[in-house]
């Protein structure tokens, strides 16, 4: 049997690994250090023989597939040895630990990525910058870091935040939704870049896209449940459900897992413990605005980071704070909400028909709740991909054949359908007057059924990990120390469909194109992840922050708000599909992050959109990306 044939069956060269999914292997099933060394030596000989038979630059897809399997098995084997090493150290068996360290080095001896990163670190420490530059060019180490990707030449409103990090034999790219970033999730596999070192000390890269396998995603189960359920709504809802189902069944969504009753009980207990202080703080704020604004009204939306949030309001006078879980059960009402509704709703204002005609000023607060992450195991299949136009801070990911999955016209029609439904659903999840001001939509007479709502939310969430044929990635460069409030990443909620990430930057210039312009210093916030109203890559708000631009806010806001500075600015609103975008007056608030008011605690920035007859306050928490 030739060396190449031997490598085609890596299981014959190494003992099979049986690693439990939920618990580490017991000591009785762990291989000894001697067996580990024999197995890793066999693996090294197999890889070396295969490398000698042909240069990696000439490998076909079949040969690369065998290499992928070898790397996967080597990674699993090294993980097993590391677990055994930890156990040996805990048992103070240092002789066995020393043997295991050598076995780990042998098992990962051909890890080109680990070798390159080690050599690069040494070169930088020794100030050998020419060598470091050479390694960067040969092994593409500059791919490591945080990136934001946007679809090329297509109408794509959702940006993708991606982290590329060194792995065993490859660079691993994972996509992160805003919720996953806030909850420190492990992310969703997106693509991989395998690296092989040639005999002439050059490197060969192979890029693969991690495509979710059909039939294993939550999307499939949700679509199936919808199709089998009895038709209880109008035909329009059935058609909407079918249209969305067809648009999401071919991709995986790792963010749709069910929460148990234990999480709900823990949350209710936490709310009860903080009830007294938070309720009193919010009441004082409401009383403050009521004393200064005639017939003041306030509504609060709570956007849950771990699940999509749903706002149910029967009257525009009610203060609502509902956390809606993505399950088939009914919404669970927060106990704090009930007390606030009873105490703070003005008498005689329960008529919703009269409210729709009322011209009073109202304030709508959008906040973010940080709950734990739910993870779901998914399976993926590797398909060929390419990286083109690689620069220092940008590159293009190309997936051959991805554009032919569907007809372009059908894709645009499906996106327009989703946008129209999102606008319709927003009028049900948000107060109708707020939805009309921010989304340009009114409440529909036909109600969207629960299944369609879940599918729509699933579609919007899944879009963050779905790649088109061509995706442009730009490096995310942020202020590392986070001392400047007008520079860096923030997470906030602009709609009931979940949080979004914005990047703030200081700039100097002007906001119009007339000849007589005034140059000034300002800050602008660009959406890294967008929605169907204002897409990713667009400026969502801006404010003048130069000398003399700070407003006198003494007494303008209650102390419970924690406002330490405020600046005049402009916010951008638009209808779904970024139709009819326009700027409205606004105010940028710098907060101390110590407020005891619900939804304000921890927030460091806020932007107040002044829409006619409606003020919309978006709160932002600082987001620090892991190094």
Swiss-Prot record:
<keyword id="KW-0150">Chloroplast</keyword>
<feature type="compositionally biased region" description="Acidic residues">
    <location>
        <begin position="308"/>
        <end position="321"/>
    </location>
</feature>
<keyword id="KW-0809">Transit peptide</keyword>
<dbReference type="InterPro" id="IPR044680">
    <property type="entry name" value="EX1/2"/>
</dbReference>
<dbReference type="GO" id="GO:0009507">
    <property type="term" value="C:chloroplast"/>
</dbReference>
<feature type="compositionally biased region" description="Low complexity">
    <location>
        <begin position="217"/>
        <end position="229"/>
    </location>
</feature>
<protein>
    <recommendedName>
        <fullName>Protein EXECUTER 2, chloroplastic</fullName>
    </recommendedName>
</protein>
<dbReference type="GO" id="GO:0042651">
    <property type="term" value="C:thylakoid membrane"/>
</dbReference>
<feature type="transit peptide" description="Chloroplast">
    <location>
        <begin position="1"/>
        <end position="45"/>
    </location>
</feature>
<dbReference type="Pfam" id="PF12014">
    <property type="entry name" value="Cyclin_D1_bind"/>
</dbReference>
<comment type="function">
    <text>Together with EX1, enables higher plants to perceive singlet oxygen as a stress signal in plastid that activates a genetically determined nuclear stress response program which triggers a programmed cell death (PCD). This transfer of singlet oxygen-induced stress-related signals from the plastid to the nucleus that triggers genetically controlled PCD pathway is unique to photosynthetic eukaryotes and operates under mild stress conditions, impeding photosystem II (PSII) without causing photooxidative damage of the plant.</text>
</comment>
<keyword id="KW-0346">Stress response</keyword>
<feature type="compositionally biased region" description="Acidic residues">
    <location>
        <begin position="331"/>
        <end position="353"/>
    </location>
</feature>
<feature type="region of interest" description="Disordered">
    <location>
        <begin position="308"/>
        <end position="359"/>
    </location>
</feature>
<dbReference type="GO" id="GO:0010343">
    <property type="term" value="P:singlet oxygen-mediated programmed cell death"/>
</dbReference>
<feature type="region of interest" description="Disordered">
    <location>
        <begin position="212"/>
        <end position="277"/>
    </location>
</feature>
<keyword id="KW-0934">Plastid</keyword>
<dbReference type="GO" id="GO:0000304">
    <property type="term" value="P:response to singlet oxygen"/>
</dbReference>
<feature type="region of interest" description="Disordered">
    <location>
        <begin position="1"/>
        <end position="34"/>
    </location>
</feature>
